[in-house]
């Protein structure tokens, strides 16, 4: 059993990107699906779909990865910030600016998962789930 399924998801994406895979399958949950859809909206992955493979009991998220024109990785760095053993909560004023605004911090707020820019704009803080650039 995994103690941190979000860290597992981010690790699978990181490993698949470094191996130049077309897509990666991840055990599905609502939170993971919301996180994947946010990555699609922000342009870090090409697509996400929820599937139930034949003969399986549980759904799977298939995340289609995205690469540049010369196969350069769109996601150069992805890391978990708030972990089960050390939660990271921040106010709207203290939200991190990743790579001076060129990266993305994903924040779990009372209004759902938001990129750091939107959370700052709406004036809400929350738990910093991960950062990527």
From Swiss-Prot:
Keywords annotated in UniProt: Ribonucleoprotein, Ribosomal protein, RNA-binding, rRNA-binding
InterPro entries named among the record's database cross-references: Ribosomal_uS8 (IPR000630), Ribosomal_uS8_CS (IPR047863), Ribosomal_uS8_sf (IPR035987)
Single GO term (MF): structural constituent of ribosome
Gene Ontology biological process terms in this record: translation
PROSITE patterns: RIBOSOMAL_S8
Pfam families, per database record: Ribosomal_S8
A single cellular component GO annotation: ribosome
Function: One of the primary rRNA binding proteins, it binds directly to 16S rRNA central domain where it helps coordinate assembly of the platform of the 30S subunit.
Quaternary structure and partners: Part of the 30S ribosomal subunit. Contacts proteins S5 and S12.
Family membership noted in the UniProt record: Belongs to the universal ribosomal protein uS8 family.
Protein name as annotated: Small ribosomal subunit protein uS8
Organism whose genome encodes this protein: Deinococcus geothermalis (strain DSM 11300 / CIP 105573 / AG-3a)
